[in-house]
Amino acid sequence: MPNPDIRWSVPSDGHTFPIYAGLPSDMDRVGEYSVERDVATIRFGGDTWALQADKGPVMKATTGEATGSQVFTAVGDGKTFGASKNVSCTADRHRVLIHAESRKDFVLFRAPSDPDAPLDLENAEKIGQFTSENGGLKNVHVSFEGAGEKLPLDVQVFLSWVARHAMETRVLSSTWRLSLFLLVLIPFLVLYFLGYI
């Protein structure tokens, strides 16, 4: 059955994000994301995925032994994940490209099965989108359309985790830049108000 939406809700216990799927009017809880003692996991379909993501451009999710210990990957085209304009995701036999249209708006495209084949964004098939506007980081919402609705649920859940990480790394990098700017600006403001400048 096609699934048009994956949503993450605000955690009730402070560290476990419930993950929902389905029509916005009738969503079912399908999994949960948590970070405990610096170990990130997604519990989905009775399985626990081990998640690996840092500042680098590579993310990995390894499913449990019950599902064959599959490795889903997302690789950005920048030095860091937050600086990547395009992220190539491979989950099972499905390939998806996440393209950052702006700092806050992202589009999912169906990628060619050959990883070396170039993707023409003008003619590529759009299969979904997400944004960090209106609390999008806290309440992740990935909307699928067309072929994206027919992706397996585990692939959609993986893409929602990649979406959350893409938004989170951009927020952290912009916060870091703003903090550095303010640290440099403060001495000049103090000197200005004291009349030395």
Q: How would you name each of these model-derived features?
A:
Residues 1-154:
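Cationic, beta-structured binding surfaces that engage anionic biopolymers and membranes
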Residues 160-197:
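C-terminal single-pass membrane-anchor helix
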